[in-house]
């Protein structure tokens, strides 16, 4: 595809990250392909092409990069909370089974994104020898 064609389709992105990296980041962040396609108002086939063969456009990378920044802030904040606690003390974090439950709890992102962030917190905390669990809220 020529640069002119690429520019006409709005797919110019000078970032060196590949479709494989785009897919890996999207999946580890808990962002579904169909969900991203809806969010960006593109055909799901277009989004799948970003995972396998086309360089994703700036606006798709902005979603990915925004989630990465949010997760890093969330991970840093939660790990900082643990710093003052005894290493043997168990930390329990609540995650939500769906977007509706997350919204009711005041979580400002989809449940899958929040779950991905807390999953990373668990990995990082356990790496430091902490005891961490994730739980769903009790049924009402």
Locate predicted features.
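A short, Lys/Arg-rich alpha-helix, primarily the initiator
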Residues: 2-28
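Conserved hydrophobic/aromatic packing and binding residues within compact polymer-binding modules
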Residues: 22, 36-37, 47-50
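Short, charged amphipathic recognition helices of the HTH superfamily
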Residues: 30-35
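DNA major-groove recognition helix of helix-turn-helix/homeodomain DNA-binding modules
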Residues: 41, 58-75
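Recognition helix of helix-turn-helix/homeodomain-like DNA-binding domains
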Residues: 42-56
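Helix-turn-helix/homeodomain-like alpha-helical modules used for DNA recognition
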Residues: 73-140
